[in-house]
Swiss-Prot record:
Annotated organism of origin: Pseudomonas aeruginosa (strain ATCC 15692 / DSM 22644 / CIP 104116 / JCM 14847 / LMG 12228 / 1C / PRS 101 / PAO1)
PROSITE patterns noted in UniProt: KH_TYPE_2 (PS50823), RIBOSOMAL_S3 (PS00548)
GO cellular component: a single term: cytosolic small ribosomal subunit
PANTHER family (alphabetical): 30S/40S RIBOSOMAL PROTEIN S3, SMALL RIBOSOMAL SUBUNIT PROTEIN US3C
Stored Gene3D superfamilies: 3.30.300.20, Ribosomal protein S3, C-terminal domain
Gene (UniProt): rpsC
Protein name (Swiss-Prot/TrEMBL): Small ribosomal subunit protein uS3
NCBIfam families: rpsC_bact
Length: 228
């Protein structure tokens, strides 16, 4: 079952939180949901170069609070806050209610599944060999302290005539364990040969009693002296 279901969806309410938090009656529910989708599309298009991982939307009492999780907050904020103020005005006009924008910086982008997937996809678009791109991302995540990581790419890899799937894994990725904090994301690389899909699973540890295991960077192994 853990292999089939969406890793984030099955963990909602256990170790994951919803990205949209609001209440609506039957009449307004579809409108709110569609508005959230449009806001996310707008922000992802507007902030393509800002390494945005996640966008949380809260709607408390006739207002909206949008939290943008990004590895490059300076690009979102802009010079003297001009860019974020322009974003706030555009979103207020689009949503029809006053909007407050919070910027959350991602300290370790190597442990964020969406940012890893974006990085691998960008390398594939620059014609980097897919095995090299996957291996580099896996090594960076494990070095920072991930318990396990799996990366899968699917499509016409290397310009092959027949599409295929390749994956690379290191460490543990226990999809059946519901208390396991597994970050999952997908992204698309648009190459001259077609679209290549990228999937990333990152296991950060188990959440027990509301507390997560502390991630510790892995110290590099000491080099062995060559025998003379």
């Amino acid at each position: 079952m853990g292999q089939k279901v969406h890793p984030n969806g099955i963990r909602l309410g256990i170790v994951k939180e919803h990205t949209s938090v609001w209440y609506a009656d039957r009449k307004n529910y579809a409108d709110y949901l569609f508005a959230d989708l449009k806001v996310r599309e707008y922000l992802q298009d507007k902030l393509k170069s800002a390494s945005v991982s996640r966008i949380d939307i809260h709607r408390p009492a006739q207002t909206a609070r949008i939290t943008i999780h990004t590895a490059r907050p300076g690009i979102v904020i802009g010079k003297k806050g001009e860019d974020v103020e322009k974003l706030r005005q555009d979103l207020t006009k689009q949503m029809g209610v006053p909007v407050h924008i919070n910027i959350e910086e991602i300290r370790k982008p190597e442990l964020d599944a969406m940012l890893v997937a974006q990085s691998v996809a960008q390398q594939l678009e620059r014609r980097v060999m897919f095995r090299r791109a996957m291996k580099r991302a896996v090594q960076n995540a494990m070095r920072i302290g991930a318990k396990g990581i799996k990366i899968q790419v699917s499509g016409r890899l290397g310009g092959a005539e027949i599409a295929r799937t390749e994956w690379y894994r290191e460490g543990r990725v226990p999809l059946h364990t519901l208390r396991a904090d597994i970050d999952y994301a997908t992204y698309e690389a648009h190459t001259t040969y077609g679209v290549i899909g990228v999937k990333v699973w990152i296991f950060k540890g188990e959440v027990i009693g509301g507390r997560q295991e502390e991630l510790k960077p892995v110290a590099p192994a000491p080099r062995k002296k060559a025998a003379r």
